């Protein structure tokens, strides 16, 4: 009886491990960069093993030039709901590009919350080939020196700049997009009929989950970052007489 019991348990465990993994958060048509997530999984698994062997071990964090011990559970990095394609933890600066959101950065020692794969735009993108233009000009960069931000409640919070995992310093980066200029052309937004419309370009924001600090504790909070440049229109008052 005991031999049959152990045989059934072994078969059950093999079946669970062989079950295909699905991710309902993945948009249709998007694929996962396997090389990137293999490296990420290795780093996280190593951190989890050390965390289990040394319970409540603090992770060193450097905030505004000072070293402080911030208690962080490495398992937080594995929660899907915290992932954002605009937040990146990396041991080295990501590629700097003013025209692209390079979400496929796969350098060693990178923790990105993004699980999607997007094609990189370049000067050969069809938009440029067809002679199409954007109504507003934008610039996109990875920001790695953010120290404070506004959270979703309107309060100013301290952004955690770096965390130390397995003696490797991971820096927190944010991919931000903002307007290059308020008025790309003299009349306002490009391509807008200035006879009937007033227009100007403005930077819009969204909220992403970021690692912040409060009272010597690290916590995830929604903070506001720049994410797009849009055109604002107002109709001109008709002339009288």
Swiss-Prot record:
Residues 19-121 form a propeptide. Keywords: Cleavage on pair of basic residues, Disulfide bond, Endosome, Glycoprotein, Growth factor, Metalloenzyme inhibitor, Metalloprotease inhibitor, Protease inhibitor, Secreted, Signal. Gene3D superfamilies: Cystine-knot cytokines. It is found in: Secreted; Endosome lumen. Nerve growth factor is important for the development and maintenance of the sympathetic and sensory nervous systems. Extracellular ligand for the NTRK1 and NGFR receptors, activates cellular signaling cascades through those receptor tyrosine kinase to regulate neuronal proliferation, differentiation and survival. Inhibits metalloproteinase dependent proteolysis of platelet glycoprotein VI. Belongs to the NGF-beta family. This is Beta-nerve growth factor. It comes from Mastomys natalensis (African soft-furred rat).
